[in-house]
A protein has these predicted regions:
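Non-transmembrane, aqueous-exposed alpha-helical and coiled segments at domain scale
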Residues: 67, 92, 96-97, 103-122, ...
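Transmembrane alpha-helical segments of multi-pass membrane transport proteins and ion-pumping complexes
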Residues: 18-31, 54, 76, 80-92, ...
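Alpha-helical transmembrane segments and their membrane-interface boundaries
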Residues: 2-60, 160-170, 174-184
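Hydrophobic alpha-helical transmembrane segments
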Residues: 12-16, 69, 73-77, 106-110, ...
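Short, highly charged, low-complexity non-transmembrane loops/tails of multi-pass membrane proteins
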Residues: 190-201
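Membrane-interface helix termini and inter-helical loops of multi-pass transporters
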Residues: 93-101, 150-161
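Pore- and pathway-forming membrane helices of multi-pass small-molecule/ion transporters and channels
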Residues: 23, 36-62, 113-155
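Alpha-helical membrane segments and adjacent membrane-interface helices in multi-pass membrane proteins
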Residues: 41-90
Length: 201
């Protein structure tokens, strides 16, 4: 019986497919796609964070896409939810008190400490959120999205509208990252080819 060793070969280099998909993210910052006051103003960096995270979590290999999606998406949402809870506490409780800077910073720290408890304890007890890095993708992305003024409904609006817009926007942007990682590999049309001179009896 002849055994032939094989290796994987990219029909289209992933450097090309990845760069092509990355280029599509410019649409996320276009504020002229929808009529005002609506606007598509998603944070592109949120896509790249979870795009890299997709491969770090084990994606990219044959049959690994679905398990990696399951590993990441609920955990990202969990982090996003508690980011929103922290944002509401910082903006609508501490921010409305008119306190001195030292006291405000102290209370800010307490809020962050409290919202991190369900995040960190939850990983011990609930299987779908055990992949801790993905939780913090969502948590950090919410804060950077909100305080940077990004969102699908940005601008000088009601604060509640803006903060919930940031919550939804952050999750959608993070959710696109693993899809981009999957498509990067899929578009490369990877196939197995024999290694030259590897045939053995």
């Amino acid at each position: 019986m002849v055994k032939i060793a094989t290796r994987t070969k990219e029909t289209i280099p992933t450097a090309i497919t990845g760069a092509f998909i990355a280029g599509l993210t410019v649409v996320m910052t276009a504020s002229v796609v929808l009529p005002k006051p609506w606007a598509i103003l998603f944070p592109p960096w949120a896509v790249f964070i979870t795009w890299a995270g997709y491969f770090a979590a084990g994606g990219g290999g044959k049959g690994q896409a679905l398990p990696t999606f399951k590993k990441m998406y609920v955990a990202i949402l969990w982090g996003d939810i508690w980011g929103l809870a922290g944002g509401l506490g910082l903006v609508f409780i501490v921010g409305k008190m008119g306190l001195s800077l030292p006291l405000s910073l102290l209370l800010d720290g307490i809020v962050i400490f409290l919202v991190n408890q369900p995040i960190l304890w939850g990983t011990r007890w609930w299987g779908p959120i055990k992949y801790t890095p993905a939780i913090f993708y969502g948590f950090a992305t919410f804060f950077s999205t909100y305080f940077s003024g990004f969102g699908f409904y940005p601008g000088p609006l009601d604060q509640y509208t803006t903060i919930f817009s940031a919550f939804i926007t952050a999750y959608i942007a993070n959710a696109l990252g693993p899809i981009a990682g999957y498509l990067q590999v899929r578009f490369a049309m990877i196939k197995e080819v024999p290694v030259e001179g590897s045939a053995k009896n």
